[in-house]
Amino acid sequence: MFTRTIRQQIRRSSALSLVRNNWTREEIQKIYDTPLIDLIFRAASIHRKFHDPKKVQQCTLLSIKTGGCTEDCKYCAQSSRYNTGVKATKLMKIDEVLEKAKIAKAKGSTRFCMGSAWRDLNGRNRTFKNILEIIKEVRSMDMEVCVTLGMLNEQQAKELKDAGLTAYNHNLDTSREYYSKIISTRTYDERLNTIDNLRKAGLKVCSGGILGLGEKKHDRVGLIHSLATMPTHPESVPFNLLVPIPGTPVGDAVKERLPIHPFLRSIATARICMPKTIIRFAAGRNTCSESEQALAFMAGANAVFTGEKMLTTPAVSWDSDSQLFYNWGLEGMQSFEYGTSTEGEDGTFTLPPKERLAPSPSL
């Protein structure tokens, strides 16, 4: 159950005062353990104070350099240590990447994310220059641009910022305690150090994790605690449902997808602890029913990845998401559109203008 203090804070405090960076692990655990129907209601109430609940950003993720990674992340298809059938490729040509970005924008995506499978950028000067050029070109399309390129130093972060990068993704993956069971080639503190370098360069941070790695609920709480107690909350927190990859240690050990209720608890808890953050329903969404996805939006998720692929795993198609949005009265979020609440100053719900109302569905 919610403690009286937390319940009173949600009901009585101004929206601004709900933003905290001093959450204790015990507080987050109590929030997580709240009966789910009450937890989602309270998360939705906070969500409406900071965001338009009908707005969901569509993002597209492209692997611009696939496979051959030297890291040993035990869930990853792109690690060279496991026999997953993924072939290593070179960096995509600039024109090929830009064509993918144009398609994504035409389909409704307003954030274009690019991932490269390697540990860090050290010794990749020519490749880094090509990536900087890609960032400049995609940004000129009036899209948000995010990349995930492994660990980086402060100077590299500044160069990315100068090129027009919106945000950098560097996930924590799981709790500090469970982390060593998943990865041994990079420490938790190295991940936090990269995030610190991003902040110093003035970049927005995208950092979240993967649920269903075999972790326990206290590990999900631990992940949220690590994110919610950062000096500045990540502007973006992606939650991934594990997609088991045959040939990886985790993929061979985990036979079933994590049930939806702990995933919803994690989204709702993160929404309460980080009310201004964009929470992204990332990998594994294709394994969820439409109703399960809608519950995630009610719990506080307000961004999805859509398109052809999630790096090496299946994504939900643009056409499927178009139907999903229609059925549930959702709208795509524009680039750089954040924090548009539909509540009045007193917390009352305000109907949107008529032109923004979705057509009445047939069912």
Curated annotation (Swiss-Prot):
GO terms for biological process: biotin biosynthetic process. CDD domains: Radical_SAM. Binds 1 [4Fe-4S] cluster. The cluster is coordinated with 3 cysteines and an exchangeable S-adenosyl-L-methionine. Binds 1 [2Fe-2S] cluster. The cluster is coordinated with 3 cysteines and 1 arginine. [2Fe-2S] cluster binds at C113, C146, C206, R280. Residues 54-276 form the Radical SAM core domain. The keyword NAD does not apply. Its cofactor is [4Fe-4S] cluster; [2Fe-2S] cluster. The modification Phosphoserine is found at S13, S14, S17. Residues 337-363 are annotated as: Disordered. [4Fe-4S] cluster binds at C69, C73, C76. Pathway: Cofactor biosynthesis; biotin biosynthesis; biotin from 7,8-diaminononanoate: step 2/2. It catalyses: (4R,5S)-dethiobiotin + (sulfur carrier)-SH + 2 reduced [2Fe-2S]-[ferredoxin] + 2 S-adenosyl-L-methionine = (sulfur carrier)-H + biotin + 2 5'-deoxyadenosine + 2 L-methionine + 2 oxidized [2Fe-2S]-[ferredoxin]. Pfam families: BATS (PF06968), Radical_SAM (PF04055). SMART domains: BATS, Elp3. Keywords: 2Fe-2S, 4Fe-4S, Biotin biosynthesis, Iron, Iron-sulfur, Metal-binding, Phosphoprotein, S-adenosyl-L-methionine, Transferase. Its EC number is 2.8.1.6. InterPro entries: Aldolase_TIM, BATS_dom, Biotin_synth/BioAB, Biotin_synthase, Elp3/MiaA/NifB-like_rSAM, rSAM. One of its GO terms (cellular component) is mitochondrion. GO terms for molecular function: 2 iron, 2 sulfur cluster binding; 4 iron, 4 sulfur cluster binding; biotin synthase activity; metal ion binding. HAMAP family: BioB (MF_01694). Catalyzes the last step of biotin biosynthesis, the conversion of dethiobiotin to biotin. Belongs to the radical SAM superfamily. Biotin synthase family. This is Biotin synthase. It comes from Schizosaccharomyces pombe (strain 972 / ATCC 24843) (Fission yeast). The lineage of its organism: Eukaryota, Fungi, Dikarya, Ascomycota, Taphrinomycotina.
